Amino acid sequence: MVRSRARVLDAVASLLVEKGVRGVTVDAVMARSGVARATVYRHWPTRQALVLAGLRHLLPPPVPRTAADGTLSQRLTSVLGGLARQMEVEPWAHAIPALLDAARREPEIATVAARFVADRQAPVRAVLQEAVADGSLPRLDVETALAQLLGPLVYRRLLTSEPLDEELCAHIVEHFLRGQSSQVTRPLR
């Protein structure tokens, strides 16, 4: 049973890379994995569950939450750096754009995409919320802050060939915090 699950997950992952989300059908997975339809449905009752399992198998797990010690700048740079390292993994370049594109057309895939994005935003969101709670940052729109911090990483990964590195992450955080500094009740660094 474990081997058939692994074969299915390997098949889904390879289909995601080669053909995108649209290429992940139960028939395609059965053909690629050699696993029976009943076995596929026993473990993944919906296509959505199959795609999500394939993404989890293909891509690294979300960045773990950082320790609460260190400056706000260090904590934000750390979580952005972890996300940037994940985004440099090759399957990311193939699977994520396909996932986001399919999410626009398929409601069940939109749920998968939303969960995937939320999982990756969570560590950054937690650092921002803690900083607002302890006065290190002024009250802010967390969604806008997430876009300001994560947007440059996504832009660079999807639209340029420039690397995602610690220096970039530190630069993004520095500019974000500089923009927040006029409203801060405690020192940012």
Where is each model-derived feature located?
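Amphipathic alpha-helical packing segments from all-alpha helical-bundle domains
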Residues: 70, 74, 94-97, 107-133
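All-alpha amphipathic helical-bundle segments outside canonical DNA-binding/catalytic cores
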Residues: 111-116, 132-148, 166-167
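Short, basic, alpha-helical segments at the C-terminal edge of helix-turn-helix-like DNA-binding modules
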Residues: 55-61
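Amphipathic alpha-helical segments used for helix-helix packing
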Residues: 51-55, 87-114
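Basic, helix-initiating cap at the start of DNA-binding domains
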Residues: 1-32, 38, 49
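C-terminal peripheral helix-coil segments that are non-catalytic and often amphipathic
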Residues: 78, 122, 126-133, 138, ...
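A short His-aromatic
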Residues: 41-44
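Hydrophobic alpha-helical connector segments
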Residues: 63-93
